[in-house]
UniProtKB/Swiss-Prot annotation:
Protein name as it appears in the record: Deoxyguanosinetriphosphate triphosphohydrolase-like protein
Keyword Hydrolase listed: yes
Residue stretches of biased makeup (Basic and acidic residues): 7-27
UniProt source species: Shewanella baltica (strain OS195)
Example GO BP: dGTP catabolic process
Family: Belongs to the dGTPase family. Type 2 subfamily.
Keywords noted in UniProt: Hydrolase
Stretches for region Disordered: 1-27
PANTHER family according to UniProt: DEOXYGUANOSINETRIPHOSPHATE TRIPHOSPHOHYDROLASE-LIKE PROTEIN 2, DEOXYNUCLEOSIDE TRIPHOSPHATE TRIPHOSPHOHYDROLASE
Entry-linked NCBIfam families: antiphage_dGTPase (NF041026), dGTP_triPase (TIGR01353), PRK05318.1 (NF003701)
UniProt lineage: Bacteria, Pseudomonadati, Pseudomonadota, Gammaproteobacteria, Alteromonadales
Keyword Disulfide bond belongs to the record: no
Residue intervals of the HD domain: 59-255
Length: 449
């Protein structure tokens, strides 16, 4: 059903080793799992700031949970749809996507992303998913120039937003800020797409598609989505089959597991659950949701740890088993023709949980203060490096910056690459070294690259 062209790598397979009988996707999974970029996720913010509590999830633990949920979704779909077993040919492929999906996210979560996007506003912007694509295909030093050199299908699956920045960007009217402290994230949302600097790799990924499929797959939505009325840019509208599974797993992990963190830390209370969640789910058109609601609510806020874990497991199971395969018969390529989707009533329930996390966790002033602080750190670092790259950047990054300048490329992208790869702790420590008179004199720039 799917062509072998999707297993091809840009640089071929030059890592054949003795008695290595792994599949191409098992190799991809190993490359991601053993990468420095993946390890750094242990010290990057998920929702609650690193250091707020010894229970919180980091982007690393989140990615591991997304991987487990993703393979659970695939196993369910295999049983439901035996006719699509060739589409669901590799658990290692889905694990690869789920493990890698957050690799490009910068320090300090959304605050760091908005800060880098602002600093890159005249140089192609910045967005975490676009950076993930760039790390996998170009930056991670598994090969000299081809990043991890992953299979084409893996790279297709990581494309949550398959269109270049220039195709999606809509210029808005902004009041030019005179001080970084004035930056409002709502005024500088990142374009969700691929950086134009990586168009050559993007074209290679889409090479097997027909012209009609390629044109439609990369076409932006016409008109604004009602849920995105504050988002000024165009949005992509399609994703591959593998990506649809990864994205559902990510959404489930975000809504359920981040909610669990918030409940344990006392940020979300039973009264908020009954006010914001219960009314919608009580009137659900799905019998299972209505029947399980009261029991789940009681267990989530129980003082018995095992009861709360049972409720979390029930929620995850409910969403995973409510996923179906939908078909868009306009596409010729099976990887685009089919997508995994949630049954409508469960999609509503998942959105209610996501909104609960957003309202009481993401928008909590203490969380926003951490984001704001991270925003200032990232902008301060970028401004310093941009002022004198050959003085302040580590030597190997200086070399990349010089090569970019000499070749007439986007040298600011090198600065974004360097800063986005930092952990929260390293970025904060480096900021102190640069700007605090009381900071020590030993700066270990090389440890991050």
């Amino acid at each position: 059903m799917t062509s072998s062209v999707w297993q091809e790598r840009r640089h071929g397979e030059d890592k054949q080793r003795r008695n290595d009988h792994r599949s191409p996707y098992q190799r991809d999974r190993a490359r991601i799992l053993h990468s420095a970029a993946f390890r750094r996720l242990q010290a990057k913010t998920q929702v609650l700031g690193v250091g707020m509590n010894d229970f919180y999830r980091t982007r690393l633990t989140h990615s591991l949970e997304v991987s487990q949920i993703g393979t659970g979704i695939a196993a369910q779909l295999r049983r439901k749809y035996p006719q699509h077993k060739q589409l669901l040919c590799s658990m290692s492929l889905l694990e690869s996507l789920c493990l890698a999906h957050d690799i490009g996210h910068p320090p300090f979560g959304h605050g760091g992303e908005v800060a880098l996007n602002y600093m890159m506003r005249d140089h192609g912007g910045f967005e975490g998913n676009g950076q993930t694509f760039r790390i996998l295909s170009k930056l991670e030093p598994y090969t000299l120039d081809f990043g991890m050199n992953l299979c084409r299908r893996t790279m297709l699956g990581i494309l949550k937003y398959p269109a270049p920045h220039s195709k999606l960007f809509v210029a808005g009217e902004h009041n030019e800020i005179t001080n970084h402290r004035q930056l409002k994230p709502s005024q500088w949302p990142p374009v969700k797409g691929i950086f134009d600097d990586d168009n050559d790799i993007f074209a290679w990924v889409l090479e097997p598609l027909s012209e009609a499929d390629r044109s439609r797959f990369t076409s932006p939505q016409q008109g604004s989505h009602p849920a995105l009325h504050h988002y000024p840019h165009l949005r992509t509208q399609f994703k591959s089959f593998d990506c649809s599974i990864m994205e559902l797993a990510d959404d489930i992990a975000y809504a359920v597991h981040d909610l669990e963190d918030a409940i344990v830390m006392g940020i979300v209370t039973a009264s908020q659950w009954h006010q914001d969640v219960a009314p919608t789910l009580t009137n659900s058109g799905d019998t299972w949701i209505r029947q399980e609601l009261a029991d789940i609510g009681n267990k989530l806020f129980s003082h018995e740890h095992h009861l709360r874990k049972d409720a979390i497991g029930t929620l995850v199971n409910g969403f995973v088993t409510a996923i179906v395969i939908s078909e868009d018969d306009v596409f010729e390529e099976p990887l685009l023709r089919f997508n995994a989707t949630l049954e409508p009533e469960f999609a509503i329930a998942l959105n209610v949980l996501k909104q609960l996390v957003y309202k009481y966790v993401i928008r909590k002033p203490e969380i926003q203060m951490l984001e704001y602080k991270g925003q200032q750190i990232v902008m301060g670092l970028f401004e310093a490096f941009a002022s004198d790259p050959e003085r302040l950047l580590p030597l190997n990054t200086q070399e990349r910056w010089r090569e970019s300048e000499q070749q007439g490329l986007n040298s600011h992208r090198v600065l974004a690459d360097y800063i986005s790869g930092m952990t929260d702790e390293f970025a904060g420590r480096l900021y102190q070294q640069l700007f605090s008179p009381k900071a020590g004199s030993n700066v270990e720039l090389s440890k991050e690259m």
